């Protein structure tokens, strides 16, 4: 989510934040970060943050078009969580012995949110893994476009419990596949996304998978490199 933060008119080192349901002035957090560069000296940059996340530099392309004077933009992303253990989750995933074990390992995966296709000798499954933000029903923009950072209802309220993320095990079709399409047709209690991939690609993929009773490495290569568009 992109947040528009209002700079304190009386002190440009502070911004307006909601504290205990009251708009109050708060210090902008500042820290030095060293970017390591192979075979070259590291580069030190200054990172500024609000409660909603890092502040984007005003030189960012197009930012001045949406940020009014006296304001700045901060970005919230699950990947900024200092407790992010996504890399460890992926390493542990490679040591999984079955679908259930793999599903359990992905609880530590934070970002980016992904669909994982899991297969063992007896089961096939799709597991949505990653930290999916929870937003208030009163959130002004639902994360679709920038919102004011000092409005309480616009703040994230946490993340969807991993155990409630969509999980499909052994579907009747006998196929698990995904092309960024919506993976469940039924009503889902938690919001995940407003935008999904088109239906043409998943239809084409499903058709190719259903054409053969048995697949080989080459048949999967052919599917991966397929360029036919149903729409065209």
Model-predicted regions and their roles:
Residues 1-232:
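Mature extracytoplasmic enzyme cores
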